[in-house]
Design a protein with these regions (language model features):
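Alpha-helical cap/lid subdomain in secreted, periplasmic
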Residues: 38, 62-220
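N-terminal start-of-chain detector that recognizes signal peptides
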Residues: 14-16, 52-55, 140-142, 156-158
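Serine-esterase "nucleophile elbow" of acetyl-processing enzymes
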Residues: 1-47, 53-58, 71-75, 81, ...
Length: 220
């Protein structure tokens, strides 16, 4: 079965020290594939700076809503869609609330449904929190204190979205913390912990088993 992982820099595997990308064997997507073996195929679609619906004047092509359709079509058929977005939506210049970001996530889901060649199961992951002081000098000036607060409110809103769609849900902030190096991205241990948690969530919730049973309600 095909599992599409659609996210931002923490799906891409951006290194907290700013030196590029973690090697494949460090990233949570690879670790998840290793756990599943050849039973399922993990499709990695992470992009640094990706948002749900917001266009970033400083970085072209980061709006998830513009990309999810063609991504789905590229990899069809999709059996399970894993979405982990929202961190970049917390940037100061977007001035978005957690409720607004959750509405953006819904738009992404609806577009995915439109372009999918078949009904799919859905796992919504609320991202790790932004670390305290992420907007301080020498860190990331695109964030501020309000950004930190919004990131801490995402899980509550995303859980509501998951309930609405009868989807799986995982709060990554309960699993991992951002690296102390940049207060924003997962380190090696964070990737490993997230892979473990996602695997556990998928297997214990029976998401893939639902996908094989036509009697279950899929996202369509």
């Amino acid at each position: 079965m095909n599992i599409l992982c659609f996210g931002d820099s923490n799906t891409y595997g951006y290194r907290p020290d700013g030196t590029g990308r973690f090697d494949e064997k460090t990233r949570w997507t690879y670790l998840l594939q290793k756990k599943f073996g050849n039973r399922h195929r993990i499709i990695e679609e992470g992009l640094c700076g990706r948002t749900t619906i917001f266009s970033d004047a400083f970085r072209e092509g980061r709006r998830g809503l513009d990309q999810i359709g063609i991504t789905i079509e590229t990899h069809n058929p999709i059996d399970l869609l894993i979405l982990m977005l929202g961190t970049n939506d917390c940037k100061t210049h977007f001035n978005a609330s957690s409720k607004t970001i959750a509405k953006g996530l819904i738009q992404v889901i609806e577009k995915a449904k439109k372009y999918s060649s078949q009904p799919f199961e859905l796992l919504i992951i609320s991202p790790i929190h932004l670390g305290n002081g992420v907007g301080d000098d020498d860190f990331d000036p695109e964030f501020d204190l309000a950004s930190e607060q919004v990131s801490r409110q995402l899980a509550q809103e995303y859980r509501k979205v998951a309930t609405h769609y009868h989807a799986g849900f995982l709060d990554a902030s309960k699993i991992a913390l951002p690296s102390e190096i940049d207060r924003e991205h997962l380190d090696e241990s964070g990737h490993a912990a997230l892979a473990d948690a996602i695997y556990k969530t998928i297997t214990e919730s029976g998401l893939l088993e639902k996908g094989m049973d036509s009697s279950f309600c899929h996202i369509a």
